[in-house]
Amino acid sequence: MTTKRNAIIATALLMGLTGAGSAWAHGNVVPQAVETKGLTPIKDTNLPLDADGWAAQNPYRNSPERDKAVEIGASAYNQNCAACHGLEAKSGGIAPDLRMLDAAEAGDEWFVERVRHGAVRDGRVYMPKMADYLSQEALWAVRTYLDSVHVEE
C-alpha cells in the first residue's frame, strides 16, 4: 500500500513540476527566420531613418506592397509572436492583445520601442528584443499584419 501511495505522490509531484515549467517558459521562444522577399528594403524607402537606420513609421502601410507585407507579417507573427500574444493576435491573457494596439501611425512609436528594446521587469524578460533576431522589414511586416486585424476596444 505504501509503494502505491508513494507512486501516486511521485506522479502528482512530477505533473506539478511539468506544469510549473510551462508557466515559467513565457518568453523563451526561439525566434524563427522570416523571408521578406517582395518587400522593399527599409534603406531603399524614402522614409527618414534614425541614427540606427530605423524608420519611425511603417513603410508598408500605404504602399503597393501592403498585401505582401500582411501575408509575410501573418506568417512571421504565427512563427514568432503567437506563442505569447495568441493566434490571430487574440491574447489568452499572458501578453497584451495586439489587436488593440493603436492603429496606423499612432501605434508605430510604441511598436518600435517594444520590438527594439523588449520589456524586462525585475530581471525577467517579458518581451524579447525581437530586433536582435528579425530584420526591420520582417518586423514592419508584422506591424502591417497587426494593423490588418486591429479592433477598437
Predicted regions span which residues?
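Short alpha-helical segments used as structural interaction elements across diverse proteins
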Residues: 1-3, 70, 74, 140
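Post-cleavage N-terminal segment of exported redox proteins
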Residues: 2-8, 12-68, 145-153
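Residues at alpha-helix boundaries and short interhelical turns
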Residues: 19, 88, 102-105
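Extracytoplasmic electron-transfer domains, predominantly the class I c-type cytochrome c fold
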Residues: 27-33, 99-151
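Sequence/structural segment immediately N-terminal to covalent heme-attachment motifs in c-type
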Residues: 50-55, 66-88, 110-117
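Short amphipathic alpha-helical interaction/hinge segments
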Residues: 89-92, 123
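Short cysteine/histidine-rich zinc-coordinating motifs and their immediately flanking basic loops
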Residues: 93-98
